[in-house]
Amino acid sequence: GIARGLAQMTSYEVPFALAVIAVVVQYDTASISQIVAAQQGGFMNWTVFTNPFAVAAAMLAFLGMTGYAPFDVVMAPNEIPIGPATEFHSSYLSLMQINRAIFAGAKLVLFMNLFFGGAGNLIELVAKTWAIYMIPVIVGVAFPRFRVEQSVRFFLKIPTLIGVLAIFYVQYIVLK
C-alpha cells in the first residue's frame, strides 16, 4: 500500500530533482520567474531545445508523478484490498485525492514554466499545459501497467541516468 507508493514516489522524484538542478545551473537561478524570463525571445530559447536531456529526464519522471497508467498500480482498482482506500478512512482519503488533483495542476504549470518557456496569457497557459497533460495520457493508453518494483527499477535507471547527463550537458556544453 503506502510503503510501495512511497518507494515509487521517491524513485521518480530523483530524476525530476536532477532535471531541476540542471535547469537551475543552466540559468544560474532558482527563481521560476527568472527562469521563464531567460526562456523568452522565441521558442528556440525554451529549455526543451537548450537542454533536451533535462526535459527528457523530467518528462519520464512526470509520467510517474501524474499517477496515471502505467504507473498507477498503487491506486489501481485491483489494489483496493491492500491500498490507500483501505488504509485511510473517508476524510483522509478525500484529502489525499483532492491533494493529488491540486498537485497535478501545479506540476503541469511548474513543468510548463521550467521547460516550455512559461505562458504570456491564459490561452497559451491552457494550450501548453493541455499538451503536456496529453503526454502521460497517451503513454498510459499505449503501455500496460507496471508493477511497483518494475517502475522503481525503471525510474532509478533510465531517467536518473538522463538527469545526470543533463547536469553534465549543462556544465560542459551549455555553459562553456
Please report, for each region that a protein language model flagged, where it lies by residue.
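Alpha-helical transmembrane segments of multi-pass membrane proteins predominantly involved
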Residues: 1-176
